[in-house]
Amino acid sequence: MKRIFVVLLLMPVLAVQAQKKANPSNFAKTITVDDLKKHLYTIASKEMEGRGTPSPGLDRAAAYIENHFRSLGLTAGNKGSFLQTYPLYKDSATNASLSVNETAYEINKDYQPSTLFNYTANMRFSEAVFAGFGIVDSAMDDYKDLDVTGKLVVILDGAPADYKSSVTGLRSPAYWYTKYGVAQKKGAAAIILVSKDFPRKTPLTTSQYKMHSYQKTLQPNLFTVSAAVVENILGEEGKNIFDKMKTSSVSKKTYTADIELGYSKVTSIAHASNVIGVLEGTDLKDEYVFITGHYDHLGKRDTVIYYGADDDGSGTTSVLELASAFAKAKAAGKGPRRSIVFMTVSGEEKGLWGSEYYTDHPVFPLNKTTVDLNIDMVGRIDGTRKQGDSTNYVYVVGDDKVSSDLKVISEAINKKYAKVELDYKFNDPKDPQRIYFRSDHYNFAKHGVPIIFYYDGMLDADYHKPTDTPDKINYELMVKRDRLIFHTAWEMANRNDMLKRDIPLEAPKGF
């Protein structure tokens, strides 16, 4: 009995010693071009139909990922299931109406209601507050001296010709979604957004999926309208309003008008899933390293498939191949000390839905999750990158945002093993693309989990186009990037201590 007890006591120590002697390069080399191609040509195939959230193609991709995890002997990550399923709510418009001063307007010709925000309501206003372009930032405030609480707000799409913002793209203060958020925070009951794009070439999309929970308040209803509608609301000042606003000649104030907004809808429920496979660790098995990528893309639009090979078939394929490499290490008796969670999430293209759901409903404690290594677009070359070796680089984002340990370790591991050029262009807080906030790692970071986001920088050419296909992937470069991630994950899984969490969270601006 005594000898058996001593042996049992020594087992964790021996496991650690064996791990220290393991050469991770032997297992990193099992990540190959052929394996990556095999997976990516499946994930980004016609059969997957662009993997929209939700869709049958997305479900087929989830089944493929689950089957791969099963074949490796991974443990189901969600209480006996490889799937963590979350609800989606589909709002379908059944009726809409808009009238101003007893003039009824025609849908698509003069207005379109939002199916993303609107709730069933018949709203009547006797006045409206015009707030210019509805922009609020350090340089201008279109709401200055205006009280819009409980009122209808009218704002123009776009921005003044001389407007410049430090933030571009989807989070610019001039973007309609940001303007909507500003009006909501200021208490608007409803919003009219004036657009030049009428009559609409594309009819109203009557259905819109979204992920939501119960809310304390209703979001303001949003109607996008033509210039003819705003002219009826503002009177003489509303004529040729976009031309007049070039000289700021339209007063930002309350205007009297009889306005009725009608909207009704029905809501149905669908579901999407994250796919989670776990490689159990040894003496530190109750601590976790996450390796993530999103397996959804934009789906089909009519008959056109958006294949999403780089975005993010490349990340999904990387997760699958990294899982294979670590499974081979464990089979050889060189398994990790910490458990490694391989998770492919859905709904990223819709607003980071899957990762948000996971971090709000974690299967494994977030305070025991030492790091998330997120892989989103690692298969292409950034054609705008002018310095360095374009065939041996990766953009690294977020390694200095939560933990002061992580960047030092990441660079040391790269120098020792992978020797890939680490480019921090998109890690700059002044980066106008705000990349740090735009992929699934951010949902981990905002819960205090250290993260690294690996990215190729390919924001032009085929980004979010049907031409993002697997034949355009640079598989040799993808292997280099994945081997770097493997070595980094190996270190994260086997070092003695979890990463420190000593840097305050950077809050997004312009959201």
Where are each of the predicted segments found?
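Extracellular/luminal Protease-associated
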Residues: 109-221, 306, 324
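N-terminal hydrophobic or amphipathic helices/low-complexity stretches enriched
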Residues: 18-77, 98, 204, 280, ...
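His/Asp/Glu-rich mid-to-C-terminal helical/loop segments that flank catalytic regions of hydrolases
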Residues: 317, 324, 456-511
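Soluble metallo-hydrolase cores and metallopeptidase-like ectodomains found primarily
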Residues: 20-24, 109-145, 216-308, 324, ...
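Metal-dependent peptidase/peptidase-like ectodomains
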Residues: 106-107, 220-239, 345-447, 451
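Short helix-loop-beta-strand segments that form the rim/entrance of peptidase-like active sites
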Residues: 324-351, 375
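Noncatalytic luminal/extracellular "stalk/propeptide" segments of secretory-pathway proteins
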Residues: 49-164, 409
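Bacterial Sec-dependent N-terminal signal peptides
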Residues: 1-22
